[in-house]
Amino acid sequence: MLPVSPQGEPLMNAVLYGVDTRAEKEINELNEEIGKENILQSCGNALTSQSVGPKILWLKKNCPKIYQKVGKILSSTSYLVQKLTNENVIDHYTAANFTPLYDINNLKWTDALTSNIIEVERLPKLMWTTEIAGYVSKVAADETGLAPGTPVTVGTIDAAAEAVSVGVFGAGDMMMMYGSTIFMIQVTNKKIIDERLWYAPWLFKGLHGSMAGLATSGTLTHWFRDNFAKEIPKDKAFEILAAEAAEAPPGAKGLIVLPYFSGERTPIHDPRARGTIFGLD
């Protein structure tokens, strides 16, 4: 989430996705106001730390001076497109994260569930990922070296773009991505609405996305290396640790890790969850 002025200038540092849990209070307030089932059926997603709507409400309550100056609420991709073309747009896949402001049944912004967050006019124009959002402006061309008038597509979230890059196009295709966090995408030909997962229209019309994600993955292995493998040179640590892990028997001799070291996203959606290691001698 990046609030920008009417001129397109950032008003604050961007707020991250599910790993940022600042809007827990606002999530509870919106669930009480609207009802969890109403939110799920209209938006396809439960309100969680992944949701942008509660974070906008947090901004409204905690940073009113910034909120009053907001021209648009953008995503990271929207901001890049805006800088290149002066157009404020967002793809439907990304917009589905704006629960409870995106209506999955009519593919549009909505304030039908609540009018307490922000006017829908201050949200970007909805388009499909592959549509042309605009063209590289003269100013952007001078700054980037791109040719003026180069067409710029709407784009999408990093994980969805990465999914396409490895061949996830149609129903039945799936990707699991390991990075700082873990993200999984399954493309389907019908909506799968489950409060334990995330839903979004897929990048291409007529298809749907069912997603899941863990809050810690690479960040956890880095933490382990820095705290428990200090004697190993950093440039060799992961190679050595991976080799040792490969020798572990099935079940790891009873060692169990609940990787909730930054709360957890799917399937428990609990920012207060804490990491636990069982079975240490």
Regions found by a protein language model. Give the residues of each.
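Active-site phosphate-binding/coordination module
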Residues: M1-I56
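Short glycine/proline- and charge-enriched loop/turn segments
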Residues: E9, T94, A200-W202
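Nucleotide/phosphate-binding loop and acidic/charged catalytic motifs
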Residues: L11, D20, I90-A96
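Short clusters of small/polar residues that mark proteolytic maturation junctions
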Residues: V15-L16, Y93, G213
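Active-site core segments that coordinate phosphate-bearing ligands/cofactors
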Residues: N31-G44, T48, P54-V89, T99-I117, ...
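Structured loop/turn residues at beta-strand edges in well-structured enzyme cores
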Residues: E121
